Design a protein with these regions (language model features):
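Terminal leader/tail segments of proteins
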Residues: 1-91
Length: 91
């Protein structure tokens, strides 16, 4: 597992299996997962700042060509489930 902080309030967590979880502030909002069929972003809207964070992650870091066509929009619950799968709670 690797933690990469891009800037204040933008963090990427990468796992050994290739899964990526991108956080804006403390919320996982985008990433990459084979189980979610590639790159994904939340369908939920949080703020214009979070939207900019997601777009920068997909366009600059992940370098996804044509993100509008190549990124799946998923329910926030799917991202939350992915987090709990990758980081099981001990409680």
């Amino acid at each position: 597992m690797k933690l990469h902080s891009f800037a204040t309030n933008r963090t990427l967590l990468t796992f050994d299996d290739g899964t990526e979880l991108f956080f804006s502030y403390a919320t996982p909002v985008a990433g990459y997962s084979r189980s979610l069929h590639g790159y994904f972003r939340t369908k939920s809207w949080y703020s214009s700042t979070t939207t900019r964070h997601i777009n920068r992650y997909l366009n600059e870091y992940a370098d996804v060509p044509n993100p509008e066509q190549n990124v799946h929009h998923v329910d926030q619950s799917a991202i939350t489930k992915l987090v709990s799968t990758q980081i099981p709670s001990r409680y």
